[in-house]
UniProtKB/Swiss-Prot annotation:
Disulfide bonds: none
Residues annotated as catalytic: D13 (proton acceptor), H41 (proton donor)
PANTHER family recorded: ADENYLOSUCCINATE SYNTHETASE
EC number: 6.3.4.4
Cofactor annotation remark: Binds 1 Mg(2+) ion per subunit.
Cofactor: Mg(2+)
Gene3D superfamilies: Adenylosuccinate Synthetase, subunit A, domain 1 (3.40.440.10), Adenylosuccinate Synthetase, subunit A, domain 2 (1.10.300.10), Adenylosuccinate Synthetase, subunit A, domain 3 (3.90.170.10)
HAMAP family registered for this protein in UniProt: Adenylosucc_synth
Catalytic activity: IMP + L-aspartate + GTP = N(6)-(1,2-dicarboxyethyl)-AMP + GDP + phosphate + 2 H(+)
Protein's recorded name: Adenylosuccinate synthetase
Family: Belongs to the adenylosuccinate synthetase family.
């Protein structure tokens, strides 16, 4: 039995899709425990590039059963568009299963998301506008719509009307928008009921029975540690807990059953949207990483902010997730750049911080303290073992490992599934 949780260790876009694609073919179930269609990822299989938004990368596995867990918020229109798009390219999404307890994104959630961001103006968080935050807000306010609700029209209508009683007051009186008609929302959900019904399961029961039978489960977290609503750079965060603890809650797999916590981390750092970013680059090297690394958001098309590797964040992510292993990605992007700065600590008002500063204000004013290592000039994209890497690349990886709080078990040297060096197999412990 193995229950492995995959967690982004930075601000997202670390390459979680690649890690899931590699491990997904070796497990029985791949579960997405949190998030929605607000965080895309790219997977390259057989030379074909797939851009996924709501579905877990495990949907491309030929053997694993992909599951959307109870912690996911699901836009049904986006779900079936993504399924249809995959099947049009020959992929088989028929094994997909969905927790009956997952919450649904309603059209009014997207409306609320957009008007709230517009109202905030310069104070806007920079959401994707897909209604994820308002859906989670309804969940914790106990007025959300769950997957199971669309199979009982009476309950569905009651819940939609209840939710809109308040939202229409806000839309009309505060934002000067038209009221949303409840019956239109009800019919929107009902139109998907027949297609959705065969996919719906008691995911917690299925997954725990699988583990009891000695099967392997992979939990594919969305977003990343620094976007966690509790542990991230609040308020510039997502609305869920994309950390290892959140994966347990969002899948229904108890924390004592998790055998490995695998952090995914880039050989440099990126971020999308607003918020503090100590190692951010505003010079030619920022543009270089953006261009060579292909740092454009899958979901939004926005260019990612780029900076050097931040070991303070890595140590923090190791701590809050209990990482047993790291999967380092995009090492190849650093080939030929001369020297590579590594952030080893922060300076905050003249005081050195080796760990995350206590307050948001301190983090916002943190200045990185760098040490520098020489880069390598050799092409590493065909390297199959750690020993195949140039010595300077080996030294860089080992230094990151020393600084980051967990062993480096996988090293990505290119975008392809086969462009990965395996030092330790997390399925073997």
């Amino acid at each position: 039995m193995a229950a492995i949780v995959i967690v982004g260790a930075q601000w997202g876009d670390e390459g979680k899709g690649k890690a899931t694609d590699i491990l997904g073919g070796l497990v029985d179930y791949v579960v997405k425990p949190n998030g929605g269609n607000n965080a895309g990822h790219t997977v390259v299989v057989g030379g074909e590039k797939y851009e996924l938004k709501l579905l877990p990368a495990g949907v491309l596995s030929e053997t694993a059963t992909p599951i959307l867990g109870n912690g996911v918020v699901i836009n049904l229109e986006a779900l079936f568009e993504e399924i249809d798009g995959l099947e049009a390219r020959g992929a088989d999404a028929s094994r997909l299963r969905i927790s009956a307890n997952a919450h649904l994104v309603a059209p009014y959630h997207q409306v609320m998301d957009r008007v709230q961001e517009r109202f905030l103006g310069k104070r806007a968080i920079g959401t994707t506008g897909r209604g994820i935050g308002p859906t989670y807000a309804d969940k914790v306010s106990r007025v959300g719509i769950r997957v199971q609700d669309i199979f009982d029209e009476s309950i569905l209508r009651q819940k939609v009307e209840s939710a809109l009683d308040y939202k229409n007051q806000v839309l009309v009186k505060m934002y000067n928008r038209k009221a949303i008609v409840a019956e239109e929302i009800v019919q929107y959900f009902l139109s998907y009921a027949d297609r959705l019904r065969p996919m719906v399961i008691d995911a917690t029961l299925v997954l725990n029975e699988a583990l009891d039978q000695g099967k392997h489960v992979l939990m594919e977290g969305g977003q990343a540690t620094m976007l966690d609503v509790d542990h991230g750079t609040y308020p510039f965060v997502t609305s869920s807990n994309p950390t290892a603890g959140g994966a347990s809650v969002g899948s229904g797999i108890g924390p004592t059953k998790i055998t490995s916590s695998l952090g995914i981390i880039k050989a440099y750092t990126t971020r999308v949207g607003a918020g503090p970013f100590p190692t951010e680059l505003f010079d030619k090297w920022g543009e270089y990483l953006q261009t060579v690394g292909g740092e454009v958001g899958v979901n939004t098309g926005r260019k990612r902010r780029c900076g050097w590797y931040d070991s303070v964040i890595a140590r923090y992510a190791s701590r809050v997730n209990g990482f047993t292993d790291y999967f380092l990605t995009k090492l190849d992007v650093l080939t030929g750049i001369g020297e590579i700065p590594i952030c080893v600590a922060y300076d905050v008002d003249g005081v050195r911080h080796d760990e995350m500063p206590l307050t948001q204000s301190e983090f916002h004013h943190a200045t990185p303290i760098f040490e520098t290592m020489p880069a390598w000039d050799e092409d590493i994209t065909d390297c199959k073992t750690f020993e195949d890497l140039p010595q300077k690349a080996q030294d860089y990886v080992r230094r990151l490992e020393e600084l980051s709080g967990a062993r480096f078990s996988y090293i990505g040297v290119g975008p392809g599934r086969d462009q990965t060096i395996v030092l330790h197999d997390v399925l073997e412990g």
